[in-house]
Amino acid sequence: MTLRHHFELRETIATILADEELVIETACEGIRTARYELERYIIQDPFFNSSFEPLTITQGPDIIKNMAAAAWKAGVGPMAAVAGAIAHAGVSAAQKKGASFCIIDNGGDIAMITDRPVRVGLYAGNSPLSGKYAFFIPPKNEIYGICTSSATVGHSFSFGTADSVTVFSRDPLLADAVATAVCNVLTIADQSCLDRVDSHIDGIFAVFGEQSIIWGDIPQIIRAENRKDLITAGGLGFFPGTLI
């Protein structure tokens, strides 16, 4: 039986799916460790937390260097990769302990390993497409990222207008950063930003009201039951993206 665990630690509000309590505990510890390293680094370098521009980081914990590297490829500040980085840290910890199934939805930014097909539902705020469709994800024996940014849902800052921009990549940190970058500038009328997307991105699915944009190779889209109760949520409200 799949276990579903709600996890909160300061700004991190996540849902963890696994088959065993031990896997969930390991994933939680991975998240805590990642947050500790991040918070300790920000005390030393507050600009890392506030910059909207890419930064070159050569020293520090791996999570810091990896966030900076992903953000550099996307052309955004390093904190644009934070949710994907924390989700990745939790799944990576579980994988190192031998887990073959662990999914972490960190406020719409998902990292996973899965030995079975799963569905990831589309939540795009007030768009008529929201809650009606899902992405069918085949088994993934390596960590995979599905990250969503929105200009109309959630508390994260965005310069854009999209109801949702979902990015698929083997690198959850890069998926998170690119979702932010694309959401900031993509419109139905101007899709030129997609010409500059990093080659390590598999595909992008964006929603603007009743309209959508597909770029690259995205998973199969299937009909889905509207289950808002499965959306990762906390005191700050609902976030785009959900597990179903």
From Swiss-Prot:
Family membership: Belongs to the UPF0280 family.
SUPFAM superfamilies for this protein: ApbE-like
Name listed for the protein in its UniProt record: UPF0280 protein Mhun_0136
Domain of life: Archaea
Signal peptide: none
HAMAP family: UPF0280 (MF_01079)
Disulfide partners: none
Gene3D superfamilies, alphabetized: ApbE-like domains
